[in-house]
């Protein structure tokens, strides 16, 4: 359900669905975007119609992120060349984009967490976040001059700025977290390692005087960028679930 579109045929934000709908005692989480069937049977009968998903993805990303990316297709798309090529186009784009692939069930859990989360103020620019479930990101708008104060925050893994908005990544390993912000100045404090972006999900970040450790999992190559590191050489060691290790030195 949902069938969100925001393109030349549906040129309004009003065509974007809500996160969910309440059905009796249950909550139905909508798919983020319309599926291939909607695009190929919208009146034009266009076999290439699913390509127009790209317009919705771009329109809901800028100037403000409104929806996640959702490549929702059916196996019968393989029956026609144009439909199959459209699916391949979006999957290839997703592999190259700076996104974090998650299972559909994980997205539904994140959406459920949105409705359960409780945020309370602990003072100036400081908040306690509780009962968030699988929701691990919060966004602050119109804070171009603020950043995370990692010295006062608890359970915060990272931050990333998008325009005047600040996205803050929370640690799944902590039930309750504290998010503190402070003016973004060169002398804001001692650097602390933090996640900028990554194609995997991360949890249980433990910062130490000479480094840090974190658990990660996901799909595909584990590409990631970290900030807050002092200049110098770092020994990077990775262990899989079989305790097999990989080591590399990075500057």
For each feature predicted by the language model, list its residue ranges.
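Short, basic, helix/turn surface patches
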Residues: 20-42, 128-135
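Catalytic grooves of carbohydrate-active enzymes
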Residues: 30-106
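Non-catalytic C-terminal accessory domains or segments of carbohydrate-active enzymes
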Residues: 93, 98-251
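Catalytic domains of cell-wall/extracellular-matrix polysaccharide-remodeling enzymes
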Residues: 1-28, 84
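Short, surface-exposed, charge-dense and proline/glycine-enriched linear segments
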Residues: 2-9, 31-35, 130-143
């Amino acid at each position: 359900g949902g069938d969100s579109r925001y393109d030349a045929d549906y040129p309004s934000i009003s065509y974007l669905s809500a996160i969910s709908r309440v059905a009796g005692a249950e909550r139905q989480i909508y798919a983020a975007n319309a599926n291939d069937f909607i695009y190929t049977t919208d009146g034009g009968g266009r076999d290439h119609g699913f390509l127009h998903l790209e317009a919705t993805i771009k329109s809901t990303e800028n100037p403000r992120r409104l929806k996640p990316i959702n490549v929702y297709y059916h196996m019968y798309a393989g029956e026609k060349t144009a439909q199959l090529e459209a699916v391949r186009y979006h999957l290839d784009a997703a592999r190259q984009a700076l996104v974090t692939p998650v299972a559909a069930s994980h997205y539904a859990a994140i959406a459920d967490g949105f409705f359960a989360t409780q945020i309370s103020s602990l003072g100036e620019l400081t908040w306690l976040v509780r009962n968030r479930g699988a929701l691990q990101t919060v966004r602050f708008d119109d804070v171009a001059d603020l950043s995370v104060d990692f010295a006062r925050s608890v359970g915060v893994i990272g931050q990333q700025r998008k325009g005047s908005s600040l996205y803050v990544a929370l640690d799944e390993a902590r039930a309750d977290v504290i998010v503190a912000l402070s003016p973004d100045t060169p002398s804001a404090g001692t650097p602390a390692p933090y996640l900028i972006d990554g194609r995997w999900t991360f949890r249980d970040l433990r910062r130490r005087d000479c480094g840090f450790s974190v658990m990660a999992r996901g799909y595909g190559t584990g590409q990631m960028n970290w900030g807050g590191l002092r200049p110098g050489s770092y020994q990077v060691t990775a262990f899989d679930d079989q305790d097999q290790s990989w080591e590399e030195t990075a500057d």
